[in-house]
Amino acid sequence: MDRKSSVTIDLLRLGVMDTDAASANHHRIAENIGADPNRLADWEHHLETCCDPDLALNVLAELAQDSAQCLGEVLDHDASACRLVRLLGASSELGRHLIAHPDDLAEVIRDPVRLGHDEICDDLLEVVGAHKEGEFTVAGTPTGPASDRLRLANRRHLVRIASRDVSADDPTEIIEDVAAELADLADGIVTAALALARADCPDHADARLAIIAMGKCGAQELNYISDVDVMYVAEPANDDVSGASAVTIATKLAASVARMCSAHSGAGSIWQVDAALRPEGNAGPLVRTMDSMRTYYEKWAKNWEFQALLKARPMAGDLDLGQRFVEMVSPMVWQVGEAEGFVPETRAMRTRVVSLIAAKNKGREIKLGAGGLRDVEFTAQLLQLVHGRQDESLRVRATLPALRALAAGGYISRGAAERLKEAYRLERVMEHRVQMFRLRRTHLLPDDEDGLRRLARAVGLRTADEVRRVWTATSKAVLRAHGQVFYSPVVEAVARIPTQDLRMSAEAAKVRLSALGFHDEDAGLRHIEALTSGTSRAVRIQTALMPAMLAWLADGPSPDHGLLAFRQVSEALGESPWYLRALRDEGAMAQRLAVVLSTSRYAVDVLTRAPETVQVLVDDDLTPLSREDLARQMNAVARRHHDVEEAVGAIRAVRRRKLFRILVADILNVTGIRRIGQALTDLTGATIDAALTAVSREVEDAPPIGIVAMGRWGGQELSYASDADCLFVVGDGPGVGEKALKIVTKLRNLLGKHGADPAVVLDADLRPEGRSGPMVRSLESYRKYYGKWSSTWESQALLRASHGAGDRELTNELLEYVDQVRYPADGLTGSQLAEIRKLKARMESERIPRGVDPRRHLKLGPGGLSDIEWTAQIIQLQHAGHDPALRTTSTIDALNAALAAGYIDEGQHAKLCDSWLAASRLRNAIMVVRGRPSDVIPSDSTDLDVIAKASGMGQGASEHLVEDHLRHCRRASRVVDAVFWNQ
């Protein structure tokens, strides 16, 4: 056998199909780069692992003829030779680019690592000669030539990225990273195109333009060739420019960017920029202001539009403006899961997409077909939008991170998540390879043998039949997981319950959950499966408890949230012996846990941060502890720690348990609203007292410090969301103030920092001179200030002043002195009364958020908390100087004293007290249920139903809840008009 025949056989073994052409190309390459044509070069062994050896050899022969030196530099190194051979076998279009631009072979030689986002952007801006003009980046070269340079630079970066991609031993392992870098490249292209657009627009500096990436680009999971979905938001760059002018300018810029990215020239093209996802689609304006966007999404947007916004990301232009847009729409995105018809609409949309696939393409659609990429994406997005309302870990843009988060949160089984992730990675690699070949936008499997064989080799297979089999198996696996999660999953019912007659089929369990009042039966089944699968002791206890737990959870306002929380707490504590024993043996504990979990996100937040707090539920006596008992416990744990931070941490741990105890008593209706306010006041005072003692240990000769409680703390009326308003007072003496300030500063920092328990915020803004005044004052300083300079509003604020914490002698001395200020002997002058009324009116107009119905504002609305409190206080300021019975910090006690003295009649008293108590209960209930403070009654009917049921009003009583509040307020408002406003 001659050497030529030997080379041909070797090439055939490496996978070439046309041996004559391959042999001829081999000889052309060898002759041009000075190699031996009678034997295979070392680099040629890499043909075995490339997608199309014939194509690779053909392009290499062209390069050898025209750019032998450049090619030789690549082939001299095994790693770069491997990258080049694989690249040329995978992409005929990038091969043609390298023939025309051999200098870009340097991208194959370079170290195959991902470039940073800023590196790519800076490189592309340099390509167009961009520079800063004020705050804007503007290209410095003519648009035409610069546009072509940008197109060529895009190809250069694609050569670099694709070289890294195809040289990976397993491309599915880096697909996430490659897709993210392609999105970075898109950001850079659009950024450079915008710089070019600004160069052609003389008045560009009058408009801020944010370009928002949507779809795969927004999620940073972009393809090689894909439409880049965008939206445009604009604002005037300065006050002299109108919104309309800014939109006009920004529209020119946006259109120019789209043209540059989409246009074809001798240098090729980049990709289409598609703004069809914008409000009103192609029928709507290309660019909108932030206000216009907000109006559209608040009033007219459809559910699917919020699903699309899940992937919104600022990509170019004014990134701050873009981020503001994303933050503006984000709350709406995470509310759409509650929208009427959202789930059936999402399912119908997916079904419709599949039905529209052309018959000839069925079975070949990698993206849209049954079992394709879209099934994985829609599965993840549906679960994200349904459960992401309360679980922020699900608020991610990309599919793979979403699947990871869903599995971690228990919303999808780990096995299903792994199957979906594995399939998604493989299908994305397939999609990338069919696009890479000619750099054309396609999502179809090849329908020819050569194309299928090329794709097979790209994913580690050999033949067309193999890739067909893998595609079929993968799409079927996706369909199975998608069907279980997205539609109606069939899960073993309540697992293997020891009592035979409690064993149910999956459908029976689903029906039971629905009958009990659970809304998301599929999620419920997943949680039950997670808690009752296996053979461990913990599982046996959970399995025995599950039927009762489901019934107790269903009795609560939010069964679905309760079941999820029960799973989270159980997974955190399931192996703890005391928890298992309590679940099994303490029926009251299990029932209380169910009620708490299904009622209160606030309680769940405390529990999930510190699951051991659940031990509180074992205690039958939930009567709030006295301040003295709290102080003893806190001081005892603090003394066990020499380190001050550890001591305060231990104090806060006690507070966390006692706060949860108060919450439980509230949720179970063991304690009324006034007792809750007192309990929270005592807990806050004891916490601050113990922490002050601990922090003072650190300062030598620490001076006594008194803390005067103000506001709701001083009135013994704290709510769950209240800060601790206060004043800090020390005795007179040299150096006392400096030491006291050091102690107070550390005290506020240690109690105010975020931790497993809610922070205690010590707010001293009511101090003399407010924030501009000293944090700590001596007794004498307070006397001078209140004796000479205090304002009427400060006299009013002092009506709430009482001992809060620290040295009681100091606080008592200060309180005794300010009695003359807050209880003026002659009452209020006419001007003082007018001043108070004017301040009240201004607060109402300034502090009620725009767009909020004042009637739904619990604090500042007509007949709300502020109206009633100020009415009581104006009576105190007028008459407490000569009527000691009015000298109280409590609103209700002040109203009681006013009734006894005849300043209000029984009807007025009842209306004011009823409204104040009802509003206080409702404000606490909102915090308990939603886990976040709000002075506004929610407009969401789902939340209102939960709050109503948590308030003891029954299921579906949201309308009654609002009507009850409005009725109380109307009655109280009439009294306020008569007493406070004298109308």
Swiss-Prot record:
Catalysed reaction, written as an equation: [glutamine synthetase]-O(4)-(5'-adenylyl)-L-tyrosine + phosphate = [glutamine synthetase]-L-tyrosine + ADP; [glutamine synthetase]-L-tyrosine + ATP = [glutamine synthetase]-O(4)-(5'-adenylyl)-L-tyrosine + diphosphate
Keywords associated with the record: ATP-binding, Magnesium, Multifunctional enzyme, Nucleotide-binding, Nucleotidyltransferase, Transferase
UniProt keyword Nucleotidyltransferase present: yes
Region (Adenylyl removase): 1-490
GO annotation, cellular component aspect: cytosol
Residue span of region Adenylyl transferase: 496-983
Keyword Nucleotide-binding belongs to the record: yes
UniProt cofactor(s): Mg(2+)
InterPro entries cross-referenced by the UniProt entry: GlnE (IPR023057), GlnE_rpt_dom (IPR005190), NT_sf (IPR043519), PII_UdlTrfase/GS_AdlTrfase (IPR013546)
E.C. numbers: 2.7.7.89, 2.7.7.42
Top-level EC class: transferase
GO MF, one annotated term: ATP binding
Protein's GO biological process: regulation of glutamine family amino acid metabolic process
A Pfam family assignment: GlnE
HAMAP family xref list: GlnE
Entry's family note: Belongs to the GlnE family.
Biological function: Involved in the regulation of glutamine synthetase GlnA, a key enzyme in the process to assimilate ammonia. When cellular nitrogen levels are high, the C-terminal adenylyl transferase (AT) inactivates GlnA by covalent transfer of an adenylyl group from ATP to specific tyrosine residue of GlnA, thus reducing its activity. Conversely, when nitrogen levels are low, the N-terminal adenylyl removase (AR) activates GlnA by removing the adenylyl group by phosphorolysis, increasing its activity.
Protein name as annotated: Bifunctional glutamine synthetase adenylyltransferase/adenylyl-removing enzyme
The encoding gene: glnE
